[in-house]
C-alpha cells in the first residue's frame, strides 16, 4: 500500500526487495529467532498440536503434512544459500498474480509492473503435486496436561473449483459454519452444555481439500461431544437440510459477502484469489446468484457424497476420559 505521491519511491524499494534481496546475516538470524520462538510457543498450544498431528496423518509425505513454519531442526539448519534458492524458485513470472485497487489506471499499472517485475525469470521451480487425503476414521489421543480437551476432526473435503462447492458451502453453514444457529452449536452447546464453541469448516487448498471441525470440552465430557458430532454428521448425510435452514443459510452467505469488500487491501486480495483458483472475471457479480440457485435436492445429494461420519478422524489433545487412540467408539 502506498499513497499516489509516493508511488515511484515505493515501487523502487519494492523492486529492490523482489529482484535483489540482500538476505543479510543479521536479517536471517533475526527472523530465524522469531520463527523459532513461535515454534516453541506452538508446543504448548493444544490447537496447534492437534493441527500438526492431523496434517501429518492426512498428507503423509506431501509438503502439506508439515507446518509452514517448519520445525526447530529445519529452521536451525537453513542457510543463506537455501533462501537464495527458494527465492529463485518462487519469484518468477509464471508464479505471480496481481490485483491492484485504487488511484491507478490500467496503462499506469502496466508500466509499473514492467518496472517492478520485468527482470524476473519467466518460470520458477516445480510446484508440489496434488495430495491425496489419506486420513481414515478413528481417534488419536495426544496426552496434554489440561482440564479441557481440544478436538480437531475431519475427512476429505471439496475444492473451490468443484461445481458442487456452493451446495457444500450452504450445507456447512447449516451444519457448523460458525453461526450460533448451526446444528452443531444447537446440539453440542445449547442442548447439552458440552462446549462454549463448536464449528465446522471447508478447507480447500491448491493441492488438496479437507472438511474439518473443532470443539473443546471438559476432559470428562469430550467423548460425549464427539458422539453428538458424529450423530449430526450422519443425520445431515442421510437427510440433508430443511427448507428453513436452506433459506437462512443462503440469506446469511449472500448477505455477508459484500462485507468482504471493505477496503482496497481486501478487494485486491480477493482479485488475486480469483486468479489463483481460475475463477471467471464475472465471479463477483454472479457469486450470490449461484448461492441462491442452490436447492434442497442439491444440498441433500452433496451431503450424501461429502459427509462421512465413519470416516471422521478426531485428534484429541488433553486428558480425555474414556477415549484412547484407535477406531471410532461404537
Where are these regions (language model features)?
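Generic non-transmembrane alpha-helix signal with a bias for helix starts/N-cap capping motifs
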Residues: 181-182, 267
Amino acid at each position: 500500500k502506498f499513497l499516489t505521491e509516493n508511488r515511484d519511491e515505493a515501487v523502487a524499494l519494492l523492486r529492490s526487495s523482489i529482484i535483489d534481496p540482500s538476505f543479510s546475516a543479521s536479517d536471517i538470524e533475526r527472523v530465524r529467532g522469531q520463527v523459532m520462538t513461535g515454534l516453541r510457543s506452538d508446543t504448548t498450544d493444544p490447537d496447534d498440536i492437534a493441527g500438526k498431528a492431523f496434517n501429518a496423518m492426512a498428507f503423509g509425505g506431501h509438503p502439506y503434512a508439515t507446518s509452514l513454519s517448519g520445525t526447530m531442526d529445519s529452521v536451525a539448519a537453513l542457510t543463506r544459500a537455501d533462501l537464495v534458492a527458494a527465492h529463485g524458485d518462487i519469484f518468477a513470472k509464471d508464479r505471480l498474480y496481481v490485483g491492484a485497487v485504487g488511484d491507478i489506471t490500467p496503462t499506469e499499472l502496466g508500466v509499473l509492473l514492467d518496472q517492478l517485475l520485468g527482470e524476473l525469470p519467466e518460470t520458477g521451480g516445480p510446484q508440489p503435486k496434488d495430495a491425496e487425503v489419506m486420513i481414515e476414521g478413528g481417534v488419536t489421543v495426544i496426552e496434554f496436561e489440561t482440564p479441557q480437551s481440544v478436538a480437531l476432526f475431519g475427512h476429505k473435503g471439496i475444492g473451490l473449483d468443484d461445481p458442487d462447492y456452493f451446495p457444500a458451502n450452504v450445507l456447512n453453514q447449516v451444519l457448523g459454519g460458525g453461526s450460533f444457529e448451526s446444528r452443531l452449536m444447537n446440539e453440542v452447546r445449547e442442548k447439552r452444555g458440552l462446549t462454549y464453541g463448536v464449528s465446522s469448516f471447508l478447507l480447500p487448498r491448491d493441492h488438496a481439500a479437507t472438511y474439518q471441525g473443532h470443539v473443546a470440552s471438559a476432559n470428562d465430557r469430550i467423548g460425549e461431544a464427539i458422539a453428538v458430532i458424529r450423530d449430526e454428521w450422519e443425520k445431515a448425510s442421510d437427510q440433508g437440510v430443511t427448507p428453513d435452514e436452506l433459506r437462512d443459510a443462503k440469506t446469511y452467505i449472500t448477505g455477508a459477502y459484500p462485507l468482504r469488500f471493505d477496503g482496497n487491501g481486501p478487494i485486491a486480495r480477493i482479485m488475486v484469489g480469483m486468479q489463483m483458483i481460475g475463477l471467471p472475471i464475472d465471479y463477483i457479480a454472479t457469486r450470490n446468484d449461484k448461492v441462491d440457485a442452490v436447492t434442497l435436492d442439491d444440498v441433500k445429494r452433496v451431503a450424501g457424497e461429502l459427509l462421512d461420519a465413519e470416516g471422521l478422524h478426531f485428534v484429541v489433545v488433553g486428558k480425555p476420559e474414556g477415549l484412547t487412540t484407535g477406531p471410532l467408539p461404537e
